[in-house]
Amino acid sequence: MSLSTARSFLSEACYGEQELDANSALMELDKGLRSGKLGEQCEAVVLFPKLFQKYPFPILINSAFLKLADIFRLGNNFLRLCVLKVTQQSEKHLEKILNVDEFVKRVFSVIHSNDPVARAITLRMLGSLASIIPERKNAHHSIRQSLDSHDNVEVEAAIFAAASFSAQSKDFAAGICNKVSEMIQGLDTPVELKLKLIPMLQHMHHDASLASSSRELLQHLVNSYPSTPMVIVSLHTFTQLAASSLIDIPKQLQLLLQYLKDDPRKAVKRLAVNDLKLLAKKAPHLWIRENTQVLCECALTIPYNSLKLGMLAVLATLSGTIAIKQYFSNVGGGSLVPPRLTDLVKLAQECCYHSNLAVAAHGVIVLTNIAISCPEKDIVQLEQDTVLGVESLLMLCSQDSSPSAQATLKTALTSLVKLLKSRPHLSQSAVEFLLGQLHLSCDSSRVLMCHALAAIATHLPVLGDGMLGDLVDLYRVASHSSTDKQQELLVSLATVIFVASQSSLSAEVKTVIKQQLENVANGWTVYRIARQASRMGCHEFSSELYQCVRTRVASEHFYFWLSSLKEFSQAEQCLSHVEDGDYSGAMSAIAEALRSYQKGIASLTAASTPLSPLTFQCEFIKLRIDTLQALSQLICTCNSLKTSPPPAIATTIALTSGNELQRCGRISMQMKVCMDEFRSLAARYADLHQSSFDADYATLRNVELQQQSCLLVSHVIEALILDPQAASFQEYGTVGSVQTESEYERRMMSVFNHVLEEAESLTKKHPPVSHLHTSCLCDAVIALLKVPLSFQRYFFQKLQSTSIKLALSPSPRTPSEPIPVQNTQQLTLKVEGVVQHGSTPGLFRKIQSVCLNVTSVLQSKTGPDYKIPLDTKTNEIKQRVEPHNDYFSTQFLLNFSILGTHTVTVEASVVDESGIEWKTGPKTTVSVKSLEDPYSQQLRHQLQQGGAQPAPQRSTYTRF
């Protein structure tokens, strides 16, 4: 019963667990450990990794590992093996063990057992703990001793432990190196044991002399023992040692290429190819032209497809790095080698038409990378060869639905898109070829081709119109069944149509898509297409799709979610009908859009749950609502120039008051309010951007564009009306040169440039303020409204999930009770934290460090009411810590010299690999009560009694 309870504790994924839950789960597992049945004990042991995953803080982990150490000490070998597996699975939690000495003491006691299997398990356990006990001399001694054992199981365990400690400890590696060398070269050591000892040498890289002696030994082994297993193990260890020490990589490249070229054994060649690929990834800058040339010559002459594929994989890795430029650079100071005459290009061209699809795919990768990075001269023919190679591979694979053909097709399409981004003049013919192949391909190939067409059309929108006719014709006959591939094809084709249409769908296109959706599409497919329509700005169509799918869901939260999306699409659709110069129409459209947005935000709030709070979505929509209200207010303010122009004495008032803004009348004050409002909105967009650590790049760029639009309007208000003399357009001049990644970004950039040009020309020609200035502002508002808002991926889908869990100590006994501390002492606040990831950690950005900000504020004062310096009322400390294995810990010293209750706030933020700080939270608060120390309290009482002493003395004597 206890284990089922523990299982229920560990399987629930609920929010806001109390510490009692962790203790209860540990107690239930402890009952299982103390059970008399071996099965229950084993089940309890294997549940510990889940416990560590759910409650990853040191206090619990320390207690749990001590209990496991007891089981290891007292149990049988099977239980010890279970504990060993748990320890190896929980490697990243080992450093959280607080009582390392006690834990190791209990484990180490088994090393003196008479059972060699028990000793072997203990050695493996010590090896698994090497990261936290790298310099334990008793462990070092036991490992050295066990290497001389006559039991094979114990010796193998000692080799595992020795390898683990060698990787962690320089002293152990230096001490064990000679013994390992003697054993490897000893005649009485079996060959099987030598093969297990040799890989230990890859860890001998702690200093140059150790690495050099290990390399000499490996060189001796390679020359002295030519058998295939020995050569393979020695060469691979050689490569690992070179990759770790870095200084011997050029020599290792020559050695591997020599074996690849001269050794006839296929297994040795395969090992050499794999190691060359490892070094190509590790240090491509160390590959000189001769190395690449030898590899090309081997690939041209090798008769085995598997080895040719491996060599091409190495060349594909190198061709995307600096090594390709070194290959085509000057040779001996002579002229440049013509690219088409080199062996590398010949090999790639030959492989593009190879019968093996994988070989052909790698040939295309190499040829594409060469065409992109090659010098400009002699490139035309190379480009044509690359395009022909890609097209032939596409024709070969597009009608084959096998996994290998689809993988090859994906590689070829990726290379094609990469080439077209670098060489746009090749795009037209490539798009025509893809459209022609679409009609002849199988469904899975069509999906991949649609992805490629969408990428090309996004980069080159001018090609969109030419695609549309073929795509719509294909959509009419695209689906005849409801299989998964057919549904995927409907979504992919619709996405390309949306990209090609550039947010303006014709009635015919809508009819064709809707007809197909009604015939064969399921609800999920309809939702995905609607989502893509919202992303591409086709809001009228997405609104219709959300309307038809929202009644087909089983949860009310999903119903409210779809209802909110429908309202948002309707709101944006209202704004799409705004006409240039129609200011009253713009205000009416904004009012209509705001009504839909208010309905939508109510539904969105109802759709949120504790598991899915929709924080980003709610904040983004609130900002959109406030932005529309600010734009509407700006139009009203511009119109007020007509209803209440500056009075006749405005100039006199301005001269008298010394405020030039008075010359414009009351509109100047209203414009200042508008400018401040837009700057406030820009700051809120910046905060939203800074809190969206898990968002994809397109979503973050979208938020940036919203922020820039607010800053643009505030700048134009200042430049046209408030301060024309000081306004500068220099810093905004390069906004159009930024490389755009989407149609929405392209259109927003175009609007930004147009508005800035109009404002700059008007500032030079006319003094403020006139109807020309207000018309310019209103035109800017309408231009921004006419760009359909894009709802990017993070609004619908969260691909990366990162959260931080904090624990503070000391902690209060109850949540409402403050922590007592004397005012003459400092409180040591320990902050521990765990970084928790979703299924794909680090997809967009990774955490480099965590920034902890601790502040304290005096809430209520209990001491004398005299004036207190401000710096003694608060603490403010900031510290940056780097998490290790997703765990971090640090301490703060806080001073509470003022008597009373203080609120201490600990806020966490993360810093990514680029050094950008993200306000991810969380924020934790704890109350601290500063008490007067007893000695000061006694002195104060004595002083009080001394000041009022005569009267009490008289009364005392009279009573006696």
Where are these regions (language model features)?
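Extended, low-complexity, acidic/polar intrinsically disordered regions
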Residues: M1-Q848, N853-Q859, P864-E882, T890-W918, ...
